[in-house]
Swiss-Prot record:
A UniProt-annotated Pfam family: 7tm_1
Regions of this protein lying in the Extracellular compartment: 1-29, 92-106, 170-193, 269-276
Record's protein name: Parapinopsin
Species per Swiss-Prot/TrEMBL record: Ictalurus punctatus
Residue list for modification N6-(retinylidene)lysine: 288
Keywords assigned by UniProt, alphabetized: Chromophore, Disulfide bond, G-protein coupled receptor, Glycoprotein, Lipoprotein, Membrane, Palmitate, Phosphoprotein, Photoreceptor protein, Receptor, Retinal protein, Sensory transduction, Transducer, Transmembrane, Transmembrane helix
Cellular component, GO, one term: membrane
Glycosylation-annotated residues: 8, 191
Gene Ontology terms describing biological process: phototransduction; visual perception
Superkingdom of origin: Eukaryota
The record's account of how the chain is modified after translation: Phosphorylated on some or all of the serine and threonine residues present in the C-terminal region.
Membrane topology: Multi-pass membrane protein
């Protein structure tokens, strides 16, 4: 039978060595997953490295409001380096070959970088809310505020991903049993209490923060857009461009993470649910693919990052370079605009 009860994963599953799990999925399925993860990890590493390198290299990008973006790129780099590449290898082998310790370390690393990335998106949303929606936000937002957001994302992720290392919760194989994650399936009170706290504070809270911040941001941008005629259109144009980029960035992140969060919540609520392990693997792989989308959005929707990153990727060429007004537009994006709201590069 193709379906299994997810809660039946045991500690010995993570020690299973030397044979392909073809009772879960045919060998060709593992090969396909290995190729997908190898490609996703490679692109994720390259693109996030470009974001980090161009930010470090060019002073124009080293602004407080860009710190959270670079922090997200670091988190998105950690996921494929410490998780994606390993998953590609284990899928190529058809079973998890790293033993119990390897499972714990891989599960911790992916969860640590993944939640740090999710918190970084929440921090980005709060940053934008402060600058766009709050009076004098750009004046008040300083380096110390940006650094506080960066530190918070890592500390928060560390706090909530280390308890399984000490007995409150655990890391266990998931899906087709070639990668590890927090153990959503064990039903004892200690593990359930951890998973509920983890879900509320590492998924629900960042999601709520993102939604609250961007709903207010979009409302403010809509109000500013109505002043386009009176304000020659320049401010409203920049505001709309910024809104489009941040909304697409957040939606891409949520669309990749929400299925995983919903899957985990379903398992927590209904302990007897039957789910095909292949279907159970899809949300996890969607979540891991988010590390590719964010740098693409930075490069192709943010003129500042695009002007510096594309030449780095394309050997000095930038086919999207603006023919006219490049300097004036860049200067507009690197300074605050209008009396009502302020925008910085995203």
């Amino acid at each position: 039978m193709a379906s299994i009860i997810l809660i039946n994963f045991s500690e010995t599953d993570t020690l299973h060595l030397g044979s392909v799990n073809d009772h879960i999925m045919p060998r060709i399925g593992y090969t396909i997953l290995s190729i997908i993860m190898a490609l996703s990890s490679t692109f994720g590493i390259i693109l996030n490295m470009v974001v980090i390198i161009v930010t470090v290299r060019y002073k124009q990008l080293r602004q407080p409001l860009n710190y959270a973006l670079v922090n997200l790129a670091v988190a998105d780099l950690g996921c494929p380096v410490f998780g994606g590449l390993l998953t590609a290898v284990t899928n190529a082998m058809g079973y998890f070959s790293l033993g119990r310790v390897g499972c714990v370390l891989e599960g911790f690393a992916v969860a640590f970088f993944g939640i740090a990335g999710l918190c970084s998106v929440a921090v980005i949303a709060v940053d934008r809310y402060m600058v766009v929606c709050r009076p004098l936000g750009a004046v008040m937002f300083q380096t110390k505020h940006a650094l506080a957001g960066v530190v918070f994302s890592w500390v928060w992720s560390f706090i909530w991903n280390t308890p399984p290392l000490f007995g409150w919760g655990s890391y266990q194989l998931e899906g087709v049993m070639t990668s590890c994650a927090p153990n959503w399936y064990r039903r004892d009170p200690v593990n359930v209490s951890y998973i509920l706290c983890y879900f509320m504070l590492c998924f629900a809270l960042p999601f709520a923060t993102i939604i609250f911040s961007y709903m207010h941001l979009l409302h403010t941008l809509w109000q500013v857009a109505k002043l386009q005629v009176a304000d020659s259109g320049s401010t409203a144009k920049v505001e709309v461009q910024v809104a489009r980029m941040v909304v697409i960035m957040v939606m891409a992140f949520l669309l990749t993470w929400l299925p995983y969060a919903a899957f985990a919540l379903t398992v927590i609520i209904d302990s007897n649910i039957y789910i095909n392990p292949v279907i159970g693997t899809i949300p996890a792989y969607l979540a891991k693919s988010s590390t590719v989308f964010n740098p693409i959005i930075y490069i192709f929707m943010n003129r500042q990052f695009r002007d510096y990153a594309l030449p780095c990727l394309l050997c000095g060429k930038n086919p999207w370079a603006a023919k006219e007004g490049r300097d004036s537009d860049t200067n507009t994006l690197t300074t605050t605009v209008s009396k009502n709201t302020s925008v910085s590069p995203l």
